[in-house]
């Protein structure tokens, strides 16, 4: 006796493509590399002049995504964590209050990427940022990042 009224084997399996996972980007990998190559020195010079918050704003103005730019994303993450490390804990709440929802989501996304590799990045800095961001913006940023596509 069978309880199936539908022949499951006759249905073809859905195929998940890279376009389903990553949103379509209007730029080539070389253009992404060029854009990030311009942003990173600007952010590092902002750190050297004592304005790390401006360096973070600079980095948040352009976020690389896509599977074909992994090396660029790693360079970006290194610069991002360097900037976060140079911002005083007392300045974090005021900065987060000025950020848009998208910028906060990007910050949390990169915090999680940094926490995924504790050998390379200072977890205490990242956890401090995570605490302050969630305290101010709520748990919605966590939910949005965990439910988003893995595009960063």
From Swiss-Prot:
Family, similarity comment: Belongs to the ARPC5 family.
InterPro entries to which the protein is assigned, alphabetical: ARPC5 (IPR006789), ARPC5_sf (IPR036743)
Question: Its domain of life?
Answer: Eukaryota
Question: What is the name attached to this protein's record?
Answer: Actin-related protein 2/3 complex subunit 5
Q: What does this protein do?
A: Functions as a component of the Arp2/3 complex which is involved in regulation of actin polymerization and together with an activating nucleation-promoting factor (NPF) mediates the formation of branched actin networks.
Q: Where are the transmembrane segments?
A: none
* Gene name per UniProt: arc5
Q: Which Gene3D superfamilies match?
A: Actin-related protein 2/3 complex subunit 5
Q: What is its main location?
A: cytoplasm
Cellular component, GO annotation = actin cortical patch; Arp2/3 protein complex; cytoplasm; cytosol; mating projection tip; nucleus
Q: Where is this protein localized, as stated in its record?
A: Cytoplasm, Cytoskeleton, Actin patch
One MF term from GO for this chain?
actin filament binding
- A Pfam family name for this chain? P16-Arc
Q: Which Gene Ontology BP annotations are present?
A: actin cortical patch assembly; actin filament branching; Arp2/3 complex-mediated actin nucleation; endocytosis; regulation of actin filament polymerization
Q: Which UniProt keywords apply?
A: Actin-binding, Cytoplasm, Cytoskeleton
Assembly and binders: Component of the Arp2/3 complex composed of arp2, act2, arc1/p41-ARC, arc2/p34-ARC, arc3/p21-ARC, arc4/p20-ARC and arc5/p16-ARC.
């Amino acid at each position: 006796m069978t309880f199936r009224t539908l022949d499951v084997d006759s249905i073809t399996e859905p195929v998940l493509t890279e376009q389903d996972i990553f949103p379509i980007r209007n730029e080539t990998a070389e253009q992404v590399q060029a854009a990030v190559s311009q942003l990173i020195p600007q952010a590092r010079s902002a750190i050297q002049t004592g304005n790390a918050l401006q360096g973070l704003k600079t980095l948040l103005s352009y976020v690389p995504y896509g599977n074909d730019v992994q090396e660029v994303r790693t360079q970006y993450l290194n610069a991002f964590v360097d900037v976060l490390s140079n911002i005083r804990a007392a300045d974090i709440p005021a900065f987060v209050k000025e950020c848009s929802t998208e910028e906060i989501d990007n910050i949390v996304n990169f915090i999680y990427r940094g926490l995924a590799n504790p050998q390379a990045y200072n977890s205490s800095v990242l956890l401090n940022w995570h605490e302050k961001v969630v305290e101010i913006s709520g748990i919605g940023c966590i939910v949005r990042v965990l439910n988003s596509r893995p595009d960063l």
